[in-house]
Amino acid sequence: MEMTSAFTLNVRLDNIAIITIDVPGEKMNTLKAEFASQVRAIIKQLRENKELRGVVFVSAKPDNFIAGADINMIGNCKTAQEAEALARQGQQLMAEIHALPIPVIAAIHGACLGGGLELALACHGRVCTDDPKTVLGLPEVQLGLLPGSGGTQRLPRLIGVSTALEMILTGKQLRAKQALKLGLVDDVVPHSILLEAAVELAKKDRPSSRPLPVRERILAGPLGRAQLFKMVGKKTEHKTQGNYPATERILEVVETGLAQGTSSGYDAEARAFGELAMTPQSQALRSIFFASTEVKKDPGSDAPPAPLNSVGILGGGLMGGGIAYVTACKAGIPVRIKDINPQGINHALKYSWDQLEGKVRRRHLKASERDKQLALISGTTDYRGFAHRDLIIEAVFENLELKQQMVAEVEQNCAAHTIFASNTSSLPIGDIAAHATRPEQVIGLHFFSPVEKMPLVEIIPHAGTSAQTIATTVKLAKKQGKTPIVVRDKAGFYVNRILAPYINEAIRMLTEGERVAHIDAALVKFGFPVGPIQLLDEVGIDTGTKIIPVLEAAYGERFSAPANVVSSILNDDRKGRKNGRGFYLYGQKGRKSKKQVDPAIYPLIGAQGQGRLSAPQVAERCVMLMLNEAVRCVDEQVIRSVRDGDIGAVFGIGFPPFLGGPFRYIDSLGAGEVVAIMQRLATQYGSRFTPCERLVEMGARGESFWKTTATDLQ
């Protein structure tokens, strides 16, 4: 049976051809190699019809134009030559669209990304809607690739080289007004008149490209270009630490096109695309993309979720305020905050106001929309307005008795169906539910700080939590824009459990004489966004170290921090950035002064600050402990799958995405090699480096996680 075409042609009475993009059976339009023949057949018809005045590409999907190329096509390529051929096919198709003798216009509503934007760039003009769903960008770099269907050549010529480089190197997505200002689109209109506006543009002569700003014209010349590429190259190298080969190739390919002409540029683009597709970095980044897509589709349990019409939050602190913001402003669910004093409520409301006001100032949000979202948040010092809340999120202090009291109060003041979700980072959910009359409705919902930025949440059912409670909590997390992983109710859950030994080892190296800046720089070079010492300062030394005794009590000596170091730091009133002094010193609040290591930290912890380890040796010690603990978490079924383990580490603590997560990284090294490294470290530094049994067995058998393990390990 022949597949329904993804591209269909209709010619209007006014001789404007409408090409409708609608990939059958899919929510999103993505470009596949097999569509090329469909488009070519349409192009042939267009060329044969001499009456035509213009062409409009439009999507039939309600919220996307084209979300990009189908990434599975790249995975199916076995060699760089195959991937290069794929790019050349895309380039050729775009060239044929561009070569049509009549105006071709892209009518864009919703996501126009990757290959979708490359198709729009091949058109002679672009009109998009003013809807917040409409975004334009080339995110291929986030998959370790570059745009392979002409994007590296067309975009710089349309909007200028410096702006184009920023878009391609970062994967930055533009909203409609930004795209108009930069000349990426010719008009922005309401959704209701998109097609007619595009048709009107198609009836005119081909839109002439707007002259580039003077700055961009200077940068396009040989001298300006040389300076620009030198400066951007240096900045990019600093940002990526040389871990992402795609950025280097993007610079090379764009410069080739500008210096040697588009023919050389297209050739370089296709070659680079093919080579990058075969790199381990791209394979790892694509695995993270697929894994996160799967996690977002995972309902958490087989039971249907309960309705979520309103949510309550206990505690108006930093976490409570952040949770209120993502619940009201991302999920669109009415929120009521309870705090013991009005200042807490005001603090939480101000948090949402500040976030939304920032969007208004940046013109990402209308003031009326801000007010509408803020109206979803209310506050109280008692339980008025809580009687019919579907789910309550508790964000009070880390105190077991207090949290148990919150459970009792919620059961007394809320409905029989109300779910109680605790935002604890360390207390067992089973203990919090110990005295509950409805323990099946108690669950853990662990957010990471800052709530509005961190993409991960851990959902922690205890032994008695019902399947529906799990499904409902997963549903809420997704509505809040989060990626949820369901983890077992064991001390530290997953993320904090693998993070603690990593940070402990960094502190231990400090006591051995390694310098703060050297340790942090070593882990940034390895690929983490910040080093472990800086991370502790950012989280708050008091907050970040609170979990160490809990983990040591549960799992033994391997979780012990160096004796007296943490207490010495805390006794000296060092909490990190929040009070201006930790391992680093910070300038006054509100001022962007550079942080600097406080030299007083070394005598305080009894260290000399004269290290002997190289950066790779520092990174090895921290990372190996994290890998070992991650494997234990699989073994103890703390995580449901290695997929969840990789996503949890990348999204929860910034494990280097180009390595694919702890389990992909172990696979790339080989379990046997990891065991050998850990045994060497155990001989040098002690038994905490002893590889766990599962790793030793896998190493002996030559097994790997991703090739031998199903996605669900249960």
Swiss-Prot record:
Q: What does this protein do?
A: Catalyzes the formation of a hydroxyacyl-CoA by addition of water on enoyl-CoA. Also exhibits 3-hydroxyacyl-CoA epimerase and 3-hydroxyacyl-CoA dehydrogenase activities.
Principal location listed in the UniProt entry:
cytoplasm
GO biological process terms, semicolon-separated: fatty acid beta-oxidation
Provide the site residues for: Important for catalytic activity.
118, 140
Reaction catalysed by this enzyme: a (3S)-3-hydroxyacyl-CoA = a (2E)-enoyl-CoA + H2O; a 4-saturated-(3S)-3-hydroxyacyl-CoA = a (3E)-enoyl-CoA + H2O; a (3S)-3-hydroxyacyl-CoA + NAD(+) = a 3-oxoacyl-CoA + NADH + H(+); (3S)-3-hydroxybutanoyl-CoA = (3R)-3-hydroxybutanoyl-CoA
Question: Which Gene3D superfamilies does this one have?
Answer: 1.10.1040.50, 2-enoyl-CoA Hydratase, Chain A, domain 1, NAD(P)-binding Rossmann-like Domain
Q: Where in the cell is it found?
A: Cytoplasm
Region listing for Enoyl-CoA hydratase, in residue ranges: 1-190
Which Pfam families does the UniProt entry name for this protein? 3HCDH, 3HCDH_N, ECH_1
Organism taxonomic ancestry: Bacteria, Pseudomonadati, Pseudomonadota, Gammaproteobacteria, Enterobacterales
Catalytic activity, EC: 4.2.1.17, 5.1.2.3, 1.1.1.35
**Sections of the chain in a coiled coil:** none
The protein, known as: Fatty acid oxidation complex subunit alpha
Q: Where is this region: 3-hydroxyacyl-CoA dehydrogenase?
A: 306-714
How is the quaternary structure described? Answer: Heterotetramer of two alpha chains (FadJ) and two beta chains (FadI).
A molecular-function term among this protein's GO annotations: 3-hydroxybutyryl-CoA epimerase activity
Biological source species? Escherichia coli O157:H7
Q: What pathway does the annotation place this protein in?
A: Lipid metabolism; fatty acid beta-oxidation
Is Cell inner membrane one of the keywords? no
Q: Report one GO cellular component.
A: cytoplasm
Tell me the PANTHER family matching this sequence: TRIFUNCTIONAL ENZYME SUBUNIT ALPHA, TRIFUNCTIONAL ENZYME SUBUNIT ALPHA, MITOCHONDRIAL
Q: Which gene is the coding source of this polypeptide chain?
A: fadJ
State the family named in the UniProt similarity comment for this chain: In the N-terminal section; belongs to the enoyl-CoA hydratase/isomerase family. In the central section; belongs to the 3-hydroxyacyl-CoA dehydrogenase family.
Keywords of this entry = Cytoplasm, Fatty acid metabolism, Isomerase, Lipid degradation, Lipid metabolism, Lyase, Multifunctional enzyme, NAD, Oxidoreductase
